[in-house]
Amino acid sequence: MDLSERQRQLLKAIIEEYIDTAEPVGSEAIEKKYNLGVSPATIRIEMSKLTEKGYLKQPHTSAGRTPTSVGMRLYIAELMKEKQLPVAAEVSIKESIMSQRSRRERLLKEAVKALASRCNMLGMAIDEDNQLYYAGTSNILDWPEFYDIDVTKFVLGLFDEFPTLQNIIGRAHGTEAVHILFGDEMEFEFLKTTGFVFTRVDFTPETSGVIGVIGPARMNFQTVLPYVKYVRDIVSEAGRV
C-alpha cells in the first residue's frame, strides 16, 4: 500500500519510539519529541490510517499504537538507515575473533560472545556439523519482553530442542543476506514478542553455518544488523587466512 511522506515519517517515529520504550506510542509523545510539524489531532488521524492499512496495531488496554510485523518490515527495508559501527568496536571484534582462527570451536565461541556483548542479546551460531554455540543468556533478562518467564523458558529451551530451533531458522526464505524473523511471523505463541536475526556464514569454500542473535522483536535493527554482518564477515575472513 502506498503511504504519503508524512505517513512514512510518522511510522518511522512511532517505531523508533517503541524500540526505545517498549510501550505503546501515543500522539502526544510523537508531537513533543519528533517535530513532525503537525498537531496531535492530525497525528491521531494518520495513526488511525496506518492502523487501517496494517502497519500499526492498538493494544486493547492502551490508546497508543505499536508496529505490526508488516510495519517493522517496511521500516527495516525502507525507512531506517543502518549505523556505522565504531572503529574501536570493529578493531576489538576482529582481534578477538582472529586470535582464535586456528580452532573453529574457539573461533565461534568468540564470535557469539562478541555478538552477545555488542548487541546485549543472546548470540548463537551453528557450524557445519550442527554443533550449537551460544553466549549471553543473561542479556535477554534486560529486556521487558523476557520478564515473562514462559517466554524466557521457551527461548532458552530451544537450545535443548535443537530440531525446533532448526525449524525456526528454516522458516527464513528468499535471498536476503541477513534473515529476520519476529512477531506474528513466529508460529509459537511464546516467540511472538521475540526476534531472530541470523545469516549464513562461510567457514571455507566448502563449509558453512549460521550465526546471529536472539532478542526482542523491537530490537534496534540499525545497530544489530551491521554487527551481525560484520561478525559474519570476520568469521569468513578467518576461515580464509
Where are these regions (language model features)?
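Short alpha-helical segments that sit at the start of domains
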Residues: M1-K12
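Alpha-helical hairpin
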Residues: D2-L3, V38, P67, L85
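Residue-level marker of regulatory loop/turn positions in helix-turn-helix DNA-binding domains and
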Residues: L3, E23, P144
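Conserved RecA-like P-loop NTPase ATPase core
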Residues: L10, T68, V213
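Contiguous, well-ordered alpha-helical segments that form the cores/surfaces of helical PPI scaffolds
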Residues: L11-E16, G195-T199
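N-terminal helix-turn-helix
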Residues: A13-E16, D20, P24-E78
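Intrinsically disordered, acidic Ser/Thr/Pro-rich low-complexity regulatory segments
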Residues: R73, M80-V241
